[in-house]
């Protein structure tokens, strides 16, 4: 949001079987000439455990303003051990209005993230996150061949979360 505040929210439902669905929305602003004003994501997946390892597989669809013409979807797989988790997302499909010579297809971008989360004795959850987004589709969206890195610290209690987050994206393009 160009160093401005964002209002975000989401709703999730998880069944005892491990299947889940959810939605998330935020205002967005990517700078001068930006046609985006909001992002609305929907996702569905299946979470399960094998021994001490937790798994998560699913699909995530990113929906932007109709003027933006940059909607896309990803498939993902995540694995957790103890307080740590790692997730890999891969571009599955796009409805992006591609420029001349661009043809984004399956696997044209990826997102790799590492997370750590722990609950303190007072019931407050603390989370640390770092992720990296790269690939041809990411380059077109961010304007930089080296992709971008995002990171955050979060605090949660009783269903509410406060998060401080940032990226290495400066001035409309990721710094190398």
Predicted regions and their residues:
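Outer-membrane beta-barrel proteins
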Residues: 1-176
């Amino acid at each position: 949001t160009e160093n401005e505040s964002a209002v975000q929210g989401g709703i999730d439902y998880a069944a005892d079987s491990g299947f889940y669905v959810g939605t998330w929305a935020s205002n967005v602003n990517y700078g001068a000439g930006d046609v985006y004003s909001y992002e609305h994501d929907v996702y569905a997946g299946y979470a399960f455990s094998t021994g001490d390892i937790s798994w998560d597989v699913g699909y995530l669809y990113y929906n932007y303003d109709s003027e933006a013409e940059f909607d896309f979807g990803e498939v993902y797989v995540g694995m957790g051990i103890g307080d740590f988790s790692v997730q890999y997302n891969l571009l599955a499909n796009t409805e992006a209005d591609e420029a001349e010579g661009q043809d984004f297809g399956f696997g044209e971008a990826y997102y790799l993230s590492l997370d750590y989360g722990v609950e303190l004795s007072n019931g407050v959850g603390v989370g640390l996150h770092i992720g990296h987004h790269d690939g041809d589709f990411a380059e077109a969206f961010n304007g930089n061949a080296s992709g971008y890195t995002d990171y955050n610290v979060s605090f949660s209690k009783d269903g509410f979360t406060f998060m401080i987050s940032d990226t290495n994206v400066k001035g409309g393009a990721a710094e190398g």
